[in-house]
Swiss-Prot record:
One of its GO terms (biological process) is translation. This is Small ribosomal subunit protein bS16. Belongs to the bacterial ribosomal protein bS16 family. The gene is rpsP. GO terms for cellular component: cytoplasm; small ribosomal subunit. It comes from Trichodesmium erythraeum (strain IMS101). The lineage of its organism: Bacteria, Bacillati, Cyanobacteriota, Cyanophyceae, Oscillatoriophycideae. The keyword Ribonucleoprotein applies.
Amino acid sequence: MIKLRLKRYGKKRESSYRIVAMNSDSRRDGRPLEELGFYNPRTDETRLDVPGITRRLEQGAQPTDTVRDILKKANVLELSRTGVNTQANVSVSHAESTEAITNAEPIQATANTESNEVSDSESTATATIRESEEQPPISES
């Protein structure tokens, strides 16, 4: 069975993760079938290859709990279920994604025209999420 999971890399206590498609019986840091994204928990930065992820999900790949949470935060699971605009480059802040989830409205994806180096056959979509550094305090009532 193919799983979408995190592959750890980086220094001690400065870890980052790649989101990869791997056989479920492979070791955590083994050779992946395909690299599909990046997650840095220290800076809360996430980059996702949206078409690659939706293709793997359609082929029956199962995301781990952590990867599922990352995909939900980026609205990739909703996009893959509805098939809406998975070819566009998506840039989403955490506040926008949270607001869209609570209001049950789809986030409008805008094409990223910054890099024109990639041809149409090689184009990959990416989703980027960045958590705000100032989180409101949690009050205990």
